[in-house]
């Protein structure tokens, strides 16, 4: 049944944000990459944690591969002073936030901070509702480059798209007023159809409740399943597949300057298998989600480090076209896992240079052969089209992954990442793709003939991820 009241609110809201957005800031031309402390450390934050993490990210080559934002989440403040200005916790941050920003900037990182569009933050600290201009000035004064803006204790100011839009627009306008470029990342859990209005005021927006390090485990704390993209109660402890399925219809509302954020990466967090971590990283990359590390980078295992440093996958995420892949089909399979879950999916999306990304995702409990036909990969093409009548070379985007032995040597300091990992600081992903840098294209593993198919074997809870390149005609 169509909710005409809700539809009317959306139409009215859209009419207000058509054209040049007042919050457009020139940021977010590709999805943000970085690190956030929450998934591993929660409220256990400090100056030492941030600075030691920065040093580690740089030493491992992860900064140069693209992880530039270091984002301090909740629990950093000690309330407000007599003038109503935010005060950092002097025990956790004895030198203040400007000192942290200076250190990060000196190491060629960007500094992110956190607040909430509510009376309090989610952990009960001072929120920014009705303090937007003062708090934006605080962030600008401390040379913050990124704001994650949460949704807790919002005084009931939600329920329609326009209500939530107005609450989040207040901080957007306050940030712009400072004239400092600050990436604005909404964290309202997809409430009130954020994907319809987020791009008018922000650079990214969360689409669901908080992620947990589970591949496809139902949890009553994340009450909406993956078919409910407009979830009235987002909750938390949402699995990877739950969030991915919620994201499936939303790609049409994201692009250059404004991205769907599927939450931080759980690679290296919890007990996901290697195939699950690869699938998680791959799917976040192709839907053009934020790629924000949620693990303790000071204690990464080799396999997780090699996933975070896989440039051929990151090149899909950072592709200048900014076109999220779409889910072409989704089918349930009888081989369910211990949680009763089992499905397979095909995803496909265009890339800037005419290539195509293809993902065959196996959410079932057993390894299985999977097939993708060209007419499904190019779902919008017609019989006789150039796409269907061409020959395509198939490149495996995980084939050139660094091995655990090499990753271990880098992690213990016996080998440098320089010259081994891709350096997007020296050569951007856009320029590397133009230059046909082989590190960004994977390894050729086959060919699809005109009107043909891709046939691969995909492990349980795993993915086959490929770049298709049109074969040159003689």
Curated annotation (Swiss-Prot):
One Gene Ontology CC term in the entry: extracellular region
Enzyme Commission number(s) of this protein: 3.2.1.22
Keyword Coiled coil listed: no
GO MF annotation, one: alpha-galactosidase activity
Disulfide bonds: 43-75, 122-152, 222-238, 224-231
Residues that carry a glycan: 44, 176, 271, 414, 423, 436, 455
Residues in the signal sequence: 1-22
Name of the top EC class for this enzyme: hydrolase
Pfam families on file: Melibiase_2, Melibiase_C
GO biological process, one term: melibiose catabolic process
Binding site for substrate: 73-74, 148, 206, 252
Record-annotated active site: 150 (nucleophile), 210 (proton donor)
Major localisation: secreted
Catalytic reactions of this protein: Hydrolysis of terminal, non-reducing alpha-D-galactose residues in alpha-D-galactosides, including galactose oligosaccharides, galactomannans and galactolipids
InterPro entries: Aldolase_TIM (IPR013785), Glyco_hydro_27 (IPR002241), Glyco_hydro_27/36_CS (IPR000111), Glyco_hydro_b (IPR013780), Glyco_hydro_melibiase (IPR006215), Glycoside_hydrolase_SF (IPR017853), Melibiase_C (IPR041233)
Alphabetical UniProt keywords: Disulfide bond, Glycoprotein, Glycosidase, Hydrolase, Secreted, Signal
Cell compartment(s), UniProt: Secreted
Subunit structure as annotated in this protein's UniProt entry: Homotetramer.
Family: Belongs to the glycosyl hydrolase 27 family.
Descriptive protein name: Alpha-galactosidase
Species per Swiss-Prot/TrEMBL record: Torulaspora delbrueckii
């Amino acid at each position: 049944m169509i909710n005409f009241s809700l539809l009317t609110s959306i139409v009215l809201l859209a009419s207000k944000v058509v054209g040049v957005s007042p919050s457009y800031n020139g940021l977010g031309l590709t999805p943000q990459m970085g690190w956030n402390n929450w998934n591993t450390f929660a409220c256990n934050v400090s100056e030492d944690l941030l600075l030691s993490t920065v040093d580690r990210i740089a030493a491992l080559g992860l900064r140069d591969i693209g992880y530039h934002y270091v984002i301090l989440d909740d629990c950093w403040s000690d309330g407000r002073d007599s003038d109503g200005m935010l005060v950092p916790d002097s025990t956790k941050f004895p030198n203040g936030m400007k000192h942290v920003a200076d250190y990060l900037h000196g190491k060629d990182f960007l500094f992110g901070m956190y607040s909430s569009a509510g009376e309090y933050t989610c952990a009960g600290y001072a929120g920014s509702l009705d303090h937007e201009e003062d708090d934006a000035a605080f962030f600008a004064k401390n040379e913050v480059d990124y704001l994650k803006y949460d949704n807790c204790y919002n005084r009931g100011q939600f329920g329609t798209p326009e209500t939530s839009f107005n609450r989040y627009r207040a901080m957007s306008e306050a940030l712009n007023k400072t004239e400092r470029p600050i990436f604005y990342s909404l964290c309202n859990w997809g409430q009130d159809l954020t994907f319809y209005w987020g791009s008018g005021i922000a650079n990214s927006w969360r689409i669901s409740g908080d992620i947990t390090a589970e591949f496809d485990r139902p949890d009553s704390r994340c009450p909406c399943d993956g078919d409910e993209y407009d979830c009235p109660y987002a909750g938390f402890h949402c699995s990877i597949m739950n969030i991915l399925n919620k994201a499936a219809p939303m790609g049409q509302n994201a692009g250059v300057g404004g991205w769907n954020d599927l939450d931080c990466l759980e690679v290296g967090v919890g007990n996901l298998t290697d195939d699950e971590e690869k699938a998680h990283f791959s799917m976040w990359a192709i839907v053009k989600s934020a790629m924000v590390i949620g693990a303790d980078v000071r204690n990464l295992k080799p396999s997780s480090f090699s996933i975070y440093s896989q440039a051929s996958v990151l090149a899909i995420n950072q592709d200048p076209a900014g076109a999220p892949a779409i889910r072409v089909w989704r089918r349930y399979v009888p081989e369910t896992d211990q949680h009763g879950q089992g499905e397979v999916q095909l995803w496909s999306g265009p890339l800037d240079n005419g290539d195509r990304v293809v993902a065959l995702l196996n959410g079932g409990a057993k390894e299985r052969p999977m097939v993708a036909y060209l007419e499904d990969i190019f779902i919008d093409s017609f019989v006789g089209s150039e796409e269907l009548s061409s020959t395509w070379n198939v490149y495996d985007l995980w084939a050139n992954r660094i091995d655990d032995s090499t990753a271990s040597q880098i992690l213990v300091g016996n080998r440098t990442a320089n010259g081994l990992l891709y350096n997007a600081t020296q050569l951007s992903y856009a320029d590397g793709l133009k230059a046909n840098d082989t590190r960004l294209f994977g390894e050729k593993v086959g060919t699809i003939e005109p009107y043909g198919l891709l046939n691969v074997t995909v492990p349980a809870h795993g993915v086959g991820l490929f770049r298709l390149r049109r074969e040159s005609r003689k």
